């Protein structure tokens, strides 16, 4: 058996014993601190109860009391943890503030640059006005440089009813529209010059002997019966009138120069030209206008229309341009005048039109311009 006591243990030294005693002292010190904290807690509980009794709220919230007590315990038991938590929150807040400040600066700088790049209204409006004015002046300049001028040769122009002007192309369109609407008649050929070479001799014979036949073949052989005002046939329209003028002009100007045509159209005595009481097909009067006395050749005073002495072949030729079988044409009286106009050869417009209209390999001829004025009258009702 060994020696007992402090010096009886050979493996343990004095230092180890002292350390054990120090540990005991530390544990006792901690126990004392915990007891003091419990005593403080017991002292604070009566104070909380007194405060709750003084509170006018009849329904105190028990969760608030439970939440306050652990918070106090943690703050008092672990003051170092509280300090570290506060330092961490401050560091985080500082980092967030440091991060937000550069972002704000960047945003401010970008907004300033973007605003500086935009044009102000004072500089934008004059630019738009200048651009609009420039485009308007350019359009005016273009429109002033480009003009469309409609020109037609004298062979294609005919006048009817004074101020109304038409050509063979517009006449053909009007006639086609009339035929499509249901009017009776044979189809009309568009170029009026197609029938000129085949019917030139016929027109010459008609002009030389205007009184070869006493009555036209298209007139009715029966005497006209008494007609009331409501039974009168409708008068011919402007399209038919222009077509009739075109047929008469083309028949009278076929393969003949102006002097020979005037010589052939000289009239017989005045008595033969007086209209009878019966309805006539046509009566054409020719006279020289005063305003064309210098430029126009000498015109015969009066002449009968060559349509009155046409044969069956001439009737077919006329029907290709004008339907003489209509009752309104048979019973109507057409009065008018024909003016043969010879334009000067030095006219630049007519010279250009001649060069365009004459095909290569043929001689150039002076165009013939015929101006025809007509006046229609309804058939007269014979007296009983």
Swiss-Prot record:
Q: Which Pfam families match?
A: VAD1-2 (PF15310)
Q: In which tissues is it expressed?
A: Detected in testis, and on the acrosomal cap of spermatids.
The GO terms describing molecular function are: actin binding
A biological-process GO annotation: spermatogenesis
Where is there biased composition of kind Basic and acidic residues? 353-366
- The source's superkingdom equals Eukaryota
- Protein keywords: Phosphoprotein
- Locate the region Disordered: 23-60, 211-232, 284-310, 340-366
Phosphoserine sites (modified residues) = 167, 170
Q: Where is the composition biased (Low complexity)?
A: 214-231
Matching entries from InterPro entries are given as:
SPATA32
The GO cellular component terms are: perinuclear region of cytoplasm
Q: Which PANTHER family match?
A: SPERMATOGENESIS-ASSOCIATED PROTEIN 32
- Assembly with partners or alone: Interacts with syntaxin-1 and ACTB.
Q: What is this protein called?
A: Spermatogenesis-associated protein 32
What is the native source organism of this protein?
Homo sapiens
- Gene name? SPATA32
């Amino acid at each position: 058996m060994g020696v007992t006591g402090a010096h009886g243990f050979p493996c343990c030294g004095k230092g180890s014993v002292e350390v054990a005693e120090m540990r005991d002292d530390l544990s006792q010190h901690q126990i004392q601190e915990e007891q003091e904290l419990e005593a403080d807690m017991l002292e604070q509980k009566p104070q909380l109860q007194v405060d709750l009794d003084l509170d006018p709220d009849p329904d105190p919230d028990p969760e608030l009391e439970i939440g306050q007590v652990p918070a106090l315990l943690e703050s008092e038991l672990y003051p170092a943890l509280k300090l570290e938590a506060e330092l961490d929150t401050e560091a985080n807040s500082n980092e967030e503030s440091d991060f937000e400040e550069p972002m704000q600066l960047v945003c401010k700088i970008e907004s300033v640059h973007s605003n500086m790049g935009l044009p102000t209204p004072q500089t934008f409006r004059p630019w738009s006005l200048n651009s609009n004015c420039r485009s308007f002046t350019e359009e005016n300049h273009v429109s002033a440089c480009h003009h469309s001028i409609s020109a037609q040769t004298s062979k294609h122009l005919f006048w009817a009813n004074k101020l109304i002007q038409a050509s063979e192309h517009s006449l053909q369109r009007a006639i086609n529209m009339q035929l499509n609407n249901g009017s009776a008649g044979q189809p009309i050929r568009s170029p009026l010059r197609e029938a000129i070479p085949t019917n030139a001799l016929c027109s010459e014979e008609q002009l030389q002997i205007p009184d070869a036949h006493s009555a036209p073949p298209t007139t009715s052989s029966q005497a006209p019966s008494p007609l009331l005002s409501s039974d009168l046939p409708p008068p011919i329209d402007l399209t038919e009138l222009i077509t009739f003028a075109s047929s008469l002009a083309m028949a009278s100007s076929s393969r003949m120069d102006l002097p020979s045509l005037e010589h052939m159209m000289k009239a017989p005595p005045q008595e033969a030209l007086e209209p009878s009481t019966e309805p006539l097909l046509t009566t054409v009067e020719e006279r020289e206008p005063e305003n064309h006395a210098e430029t126009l050749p000498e015109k015969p005073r009066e002449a009968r229309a060559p349509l009155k002495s046409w044969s069956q072949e001439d009737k077919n030729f006329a029907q290709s341009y004008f339907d003489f079988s209509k009752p309104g044409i048979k019973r109507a009286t057409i009065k008018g005048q024909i003016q043969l106009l010879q334009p000067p050869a030095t006219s630049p417009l007519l010279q250009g039109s001649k060069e365009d209209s004459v095909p290569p390999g043929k001689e150039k001829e002076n165009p013939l311009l015929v101006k025809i004025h007509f006046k229609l009258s309804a058939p007269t009702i014979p007296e009983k």
